[in-house]
Amino acid sequence: MALHATYLGANGWLLEFGELRVLVDPWLTGPLEFPPGAWFFRGELPQERPAPLPVDLLVLTQGLPDHCHPASLALLPPTTPVVGSPAAVARARALGFSELTALAHGARHCHEQLQLTASAGAPVPQLENGYLFDHPEGRIYLEPHGFLDPTLPEQPLDAVITPVVDLGLPVVGAFVKGQQVLPQLVQRFKPLAVLVSTTGGEVRFEGALNRLLWLKGSLEAAAAVLPEGCRLIDSRAGERYLLKQHQPSTAGASAGGAKAGTAAG
């Protein structure tokens, strides 16, 4: 068995903990718009994608449309279990999903062998969620805006999914703090891999708001922060990354030979 992560562009991920498939914040089809309309902010995908079915669990960090995208969520069966922030769960309920769990900060939810812990995330403006995924196949921390809950204890993780640059607006300041948070994430979790999120996928943006955005940081600056032994993965939309693989036991390898090795992959 193994731990895999497939980047879907923007904030979207498919996390595979062995055979358990967890979809996070998918934007797969159609445009992305923020009120009051396209003139203010509009995003278009370079390539639309089908829903990566089957999905065992849908996890939503925020209720905003770039995390809780109506047209993309409509591609999923309404019986798909949903875990999310209170704002995200309210959106999912309005879209017809029926098996819903809203997690407050610090609350936990178990789905099969996966334990999901909600952490305080980005204030947009209500405080949304980050998540700690804990499964026998691996452990991941994910927060899409570069915010780290100070109450999360130090613990070794297999991977951290985070932006690595800051994005902001004049007067408002940074609302994505990837560059600022990366050293804290590395110190807190000592991850074996950091997967770049949020700002990837070659999405095309336009509108009045987009023209005001500023960016600070780079992949090169992020790589310089990471300690030896920690991989920086410049995530590409559609790519599936192997983060951890359990080796078969000596007894199993000798009994099963090549077959056991194939099953592990």
Q: What is the predicted role of each segment?
A:
Residues G96-G106, P153-P156, P170-V171, Q179-G265:
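Binuclear metal-ion centers of metallo-dependent hydrolases, dominated by the metallo-beta-lactamase
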Residues L20-V59, P70-S72, F147-P153:
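Pre-active-site segment of Zn-dependent metallo-hydrolases
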Residues P70-P77, F205-R211:
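Metal-dependent catalytic neighborhoods of phosphoester/phosphodiester hydrolases
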Residues M1-E44, P191, L209-N210, G217, ...:
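Zn-dependent metallo-beta-lactamase
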Residues A122-R188:
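Active-site-proximal loop/helix segments of hydrolase catalytic cores
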Residues V24-D25, V55-C68, V83-S85, Y141-G146, ...:
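Active-site neighborhood of phospho(di)ester-bond hydrolases with catalytic His/Asp-centered motifs
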Residues P31, G63-C68, V89-R91, A107-C110, ...:
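Active-site environment of divalent metal-dependent phosphoester hydrolases
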Residues G84-E137, I233-A251:
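Metallo-beta-lactamase
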